[in-house]
């Protein structure tokens, strides 16, 4: 059974001006160092909090790579939750679960013309190796069983429901199109992601 290990106050966002709390956990199945970032004490004051399960993306979240929209989705969510409250479950699942070095190998294949899924498949991996059981364990540790899920990804919806979390509403993020990621985004849309390119 997972439990909260520590709860630390800090300022987040690109300008480090948004108050939040970062929670660590013990008892997670794989012992990966996943964290929750909580805004406006949403786990204590909201019966159905806004939640995003965000998989780590070093290239996008930290270095603002042109290859994906992960950093923009994260920042959009931080800004949204700074106003309405919510919880980001930051999951150590780099490269849809294949790891950083394998993701960089996949980038090389994408440079040769493959899309993100074809590249992963060429390396011997499935389209998406992530499992969200530990995300459910983190929510359970916070006594949360019903959420509003921020995602465009139907796999996340299905997986978290299968682990006993009720979804009251699905909230989509914007399609963050920029030079270098349009092919990537259209590949995701072709695999079922709900992306609105008109906004």
UniProtKB/Swiss-Prot annotation:
MF terms (GO), sorted A to Z: GTP binding; GTP cyclohydrolase II activity; zinc ion binding
Top-level EC class as recorded in UniProt: hydrolase
Gene3D superfamilies xrefs: GTP cyclohydrolase II (3.40.50.10990)
CDD domains: GTP_cyclohydro2
UniProt pathway annotation: Cofactor biosynthesis; riboflavin biosynthesis; 5-amino-6-(D-ribitylamino)uracil from GTP: step 1/4
HAMAP family assigned: RibA
Protein's name in the database: GTP cyclohydrolase-2
Lineage, top ranks: Bacteria, Pseudomonadati, Pseudomonadota, Gammaproteobacteria, Vibrionales
